[in-house]
Amino acid sequence: MIFLLVFHTLVFSYWVFHIQSLVDAALGMRNVGERDSASGIDWVIQGVRGLSLMRLRRPLMALFSMALLCSVGFSAASVQARSLVLAIQGEPETGFDPIMGWGRYGHPLFQSTLLRFDPQMNLQGDLATSWVLSDDRLVWRITLRDDAVFSDGTPLTAEDVVFTFNTARDADGLADVKALKQARVVNDHTVELVLNKPRITFLNELVSLGIVPKATYGQGYARHPVGSGPFQMVEWREGAQLVVKPNPYWYGQSIPFERVTFVFGGEQTGLTLARTGQAQMVAVPPAQADQPPEGMHLLSVKSVDNRGIAFPVVPAEGQTTVSGAPIGNRVTADRAIRVAVNQGLDRDALVQLALNGHGRPALGPVDGLPWNNPQAHQVSYDPDAARKTLNAAGWVDQDGDGIRERDGVKARFKLYYAAADSTRQALALGAAQQLALIGIQVEPVGASWNEIKHYMHQSPVVMGWGALSAGEMRNLYSGATAGQGYFNTGFYQNAEVDQHMAQAEAAASYEDSLAQWQAAQWDGHTGFGVKGDAPWAWMVNLQHTYWVSDCLETGPLQIHPHGHGFPITHDLPSWRWTCEP
Amino acid sequence: MNSWWGRLMMKRLCRLVWLLPLTAVLLFTLVSLAPIDPVQAYVGARMSMIGPEQQAAIEAAWGLDQPGWIRFFHWLAHLVQGDLGDSISYNAPVLTVLVERFPASLALMGCSFLAAFVVGSGLGVLAAACQGRWPDRLIRGWAMVISVSPGFWIALLFISIFAVQLAWLPSCCALPPGVTQDEAHWWQYGRHLVLPVLTLSIYGTGPLILHVRQRLIGFLDGPSARHLRLHGMSSTRLALGPGSRHALGSAVTVHLASIGELFGGSVLAETIFAWPGLGQATVKAATGADAPLLLGIALVTVVVVLLGNLLADILAAWVDPRLRIMPQEETLPRLKRLPWLKASARLKTASRLKVEPKS
Amino acid sequence: MKRVMVSIVSIVTRSDDTGKSYRLALFMAIVVTLMIWGGGALPDTMMAVNPAQRSLAPSWQHWLGTDLLGRDMASRTLAGLAQSLKVGLLAAALSTLLAMVMGMMAALNRSLDRLVSSLTDMMLGMPHFVLLIMVAYAFGGGTVGVTWAVALTHWPRLARLLRHEAKTLVKSDYVQVSRSLGRSNLWLARHHLMPHLMPQWIAGFVVIFPHAILHEAGLSFIGLGIEPHLPSIGVMLANSLNAMLAGFWWVVLAPGLGLMLVAFGFERLGERLRRQALPPDRGSSGVSPGQVA
């Protein structure tokens, strides 16, 4: 068998050597366009003809070519000085068009945005030098810096900003700018964005929507982006890698890298590159993060990439959604059950079990973000408190089967999770074990999202969210989004919470809105936190794990949103190389 | 159109006329049956930031709010104009995606195709020449083993041996990181091709080895071989000369007919080796609910397989003139000719292709 | 009962080719039963995540080592094979059933015959794996998807063969007599065709079976097959990539080898049965895998 393997390799390497012209023609079709496609067929025919008698002379040739291949292969040092290779996955298959959704997470690389968050989540101007909201909270007046230039050399003006926002509003991509009524030019460096209704979370669009040039934006833009950001594209081989270099026209600080390469492909691609020393930063799955190779260290980044249990909070009374999905659950409709679950979950154990320790307990949906209200989610692992809560509410185990009941209703429910996700599976199984101790029987059910869609208004589901915008929180807890898509699956509704969130949206500034967002979680007598209605039991926040070269200094990192990988590029322009080149 | 290959082409074209539309309907039915919500697959993790209004707009932009049969006719109308629709997961016309990704796949599949043919038929000839002795047994065992081992598993073993343990060859991608196409040397392409091609070609050699061996043994036991041997031709020369010619003609046919399998193998190989070709796009389309792209890829592969079969027939007839449809048969009355011709042609082909019984 | 036992024993202990086939068949049947029964009955503790025992090399305690999450590879492989065998059995059964129905329909009704043969042609003209992906996609993936995908793509060759056989049968005198006596097509199929097609049908089943499990593994590998929370060879191999790059070769070796051995056993059995029950293929009798499946 080994003999055959070697034989196969030899003969094959001979072929590799000789069909180079075909490979060239095929892979470099753009450059070598003059080669006609007949060459492939020629090779087949010649191969057939040459087969019969020439075979014996070939092994020698093959041996020679094999040796040559290996020797040239080893002398190749592919990484040049001060060029950076990142294998953090997350290839944007749809291209680099902000209007279709590029740049929502991490840095848009090629484009710049009006505003940005610094690592501590404070708002800063990027293209904008001032941003003022009108008294009726409907018009943003934004002044632009005057030194912004696109990478093709043309200056960025108010026209481009207005064009970008209006086009994004009408586009059917992954940038939801539907809240915008109209963007208009005031003068060369001032624009006004008019909203449909007061909405402070529109700031999120100012932070994430990269500005495109009006003059050259068109069909092929997504694959050949031009922007005023820190980088410009050198080459994007789809499915393989993206190569960028600093944009000489960028208005920011100088970037210490001649070239930055993003290698795509699966997790295993990154692991290989890390082990062979070819990549300086690699996104690794938590299960394997603990043994970084020589010259690299583990970087574990905090995130709000959270997982929790969404409870149906209305009792089952036979109602269904338009699509016929049943609504309501008579067990989880009782607040006592939901609070007891919150108290009975050992979140530290779940972090160990499901995340290999690379995570932190989640108490609320926005742990660590400026609009979080820690008071609202004060809960710790305390089975005794959970039992007390249940006893007080009348849930007692009378028949001695280990499951509590009240009025003939057993304290049990199914817990759905996406079967394709092993982390969620571990969380569901772990939660079931822990809750059995306090007398609640949980039956974990792995299912596809299509099945979950049908049962999610009736049974608790393991869900994950985590965006860097309070808009997400509004979507999850607002009575207006009850039953809409995956947002508020439990039909949670609290008029006071809605009131606080509406006030937050109508705030005069980002800073002013924070207090109202916090009040929605707990305002002293109600809220959606555990102290209040507890429609969710949050379990864990993931930590995103990377292997980083010891020579690479990334500085302070922003807390990560949902999505492992690309968010780490948020401050890429300020990264430094600390070793000699 | 009087030549033999012209007639063959005509026959195949007629087949295409009913086969392609039927295939199109079947494929479209399959993708429309899928219970996967494409909007959800597209939006993915950003679900929380995409409001219901925007989701409805996306749905309308893709025409998903219309019933299936209307979508089918839309698609068909565009297809006739050479437009395969727009890929959802790549946000580009399907045709662009296919053209963009085809070269990488062609390089991979082309090399594997040739390598498999060379190695497969070579081993087949070797096995037949040493019939019954240890090389024959070894090769037959090898062919049996690889025909039942999962191709992707072989790929993993190769990576384990050559990329991880020995560290001779790269285990991923088409080029080293940080190198653009303009800067790349041909040997860099070559090095990165080795493992994927090795995997893909090994998978295709199994049936070929057995086929060539069988044919060659049939020839060597036949009267013509006996005749040549009596005239003093050595067994080796017999096997390599006229024997090989006898066996390889049909080997080409068998091998070309396996193009479909090759594409299937490339889907798995490209996934493992992070090869930026059509196979990778297929997986992305299937897991990302990208129905237009999936349809496009399926249609293109159907056409490629049909072309492969056509090429197989032409090559087979070119190598072996007896397989050509002879012009004199053309003179028979048209109505009666067709069924008769088919039957007789089949009979003749059968008797000629038949392995002579071992004496 | 005693006579049945005696005849079974006498067949199994025969020293000729038939006896060998039966012995192999009996052996494979025992293997399958043991695996499905054993794989399903494995204690959960063997498969539980155990951070203290991550990536251990094969030892006396763990014959085939442990994976990245500390699960015993031997148990996982066994459970994965059981899962694969279940899906394979179901899919192959559905597939051969479909082939049988198609073949008989074609033989008994001329217009259905045209439909069946053009359907067969179409299915054979399409690249196999692409079709598998499309059908799996149509059913939304998962265990259900992969079962249907394999079932709906493996019937054409067997159907073509059974159609041919059934057509010969229909032409025979006794069928013609029955037909002229006014027997319905259903009756003819049940009493005349089915019994005669049984051997081919069984041989077809055994030949299709290894293909079914190999293709199931392939689909699961790319994420369109069995859900990752169930043990299955394809999923295990897909997850083993990372471990293998870290040098843990045993994680890859065991599942693949297990799958290969099972497939190999059935391939040999199918080859034997095919030689006995199915007419020899013209030209290329040595090429086993693609012929019927």
Language-model features, listed with the residues they occupy:
Chain B
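Hydrophobic alpha-helical membrane-insertion segments
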Residues: 20-29, 145-162, 254-260
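Membrane-interfacial helix-loop-helix junctions in multi-pass membrane proteins
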Residues: 59-68, 85-90, 94, 176-193, ...
